[in-house]
Amino acid sequence: MMKGMKRITVNWHLEKDCNYKCKFCYAHFSHINTNLNIDQGFSLIDEIKKNDIYKINFAGGEPLLNKNVGEFIKYSKQQGLKTSIITNGSRMTKKWLTKYGRNLDQIGISCDSLDNITNTKIGRGFGNHVEITERLLSRINLMNENDGLNIQTKLNTVVLRNNHMEDWNDFIIRNNVRRWKVFKILKIVGENDHVYDGLSINDKQFYNFIDRHRLLNDKGILVKEDNEDMSNSYIMITPDGKFYQNSNNQYIYSESILDVGFKNAIKQTGFDYETYEKRGGDYSL
């Protein structure tokens, strides 16, 4: 299945817990009781590497709540994988970056509004998330310049009713963000369908937001994803080591990858490379 494919990313949601309460979240994993332990995690990374994967992205929940995330990143890099992490930034300290930053190719930060009141209303932090985001971006840029790190910065933003009128142009340029993923809020049954109607926007509102940032789009910084782009176009792994896939606005799950192997497990959930490529997933670090 992977033959001829290039630069495939696997998103391992290794930690189910989170210290934020984003209302639109579609990765609660409320039915999962445990994460993989460190030995199981190393075995999972071995399986990923054996199947011609280009990059592993560590996500959550909040991945920095997982005590083993740094060692998993380090091990992945040792196996020759490109590495990235998506975090809310609240727990990524200079000490952590000093220890593990050389093993990271990309750090993505989730931030949905440039207004702290709006962030708080939607559950993104506790009133200072804009400052947390900008401080971390600045820290990464400085450590790249002064400490020999080579980490690309990325921002993830979910566009919904509360923020679709905002203008991010200055913020993105000022903070040297290399890649900005802009998602239209996605409805997932059993995850956020109970709040979706109060947060959703229509296509016109979403594409007005994209058009407002056309300069960033022209520069290749902005990468938009509407709901169609997010269907069957990600390779995602649960905290307990199963593939899962967004299909028709609900998740389907495979058997354990460690039990049946990567190739057998991914056949159970599917993956559409053409949609992955269309949404800009195939890119180099």
Model-assigned labels for residue ranges:
Residues 14, 60-61, 85-89, 111-113, ...:
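A cross-domain feature marking catalytic cores of carbohydrate-active enzymes
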Residues 2-84, 91-98:
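Conserved alpha-helical substructure of the radical SAM core
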Residues 72-73, 98-105, 123-124, 196-197:
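Short low-complexity, flexible loop/linker segments enriched in glycine and/or proline
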Residues 20, 66, 114-116, 188:
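Active-site loop signature of alpha/beta-hydrolase-fold enzymes
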Residues 95-114, 171-182:
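Structural recognition of alpha->loop->beta junctions
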Residues 50, 78, 101-102, 148, ...:
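Residues at the C-terminal ends
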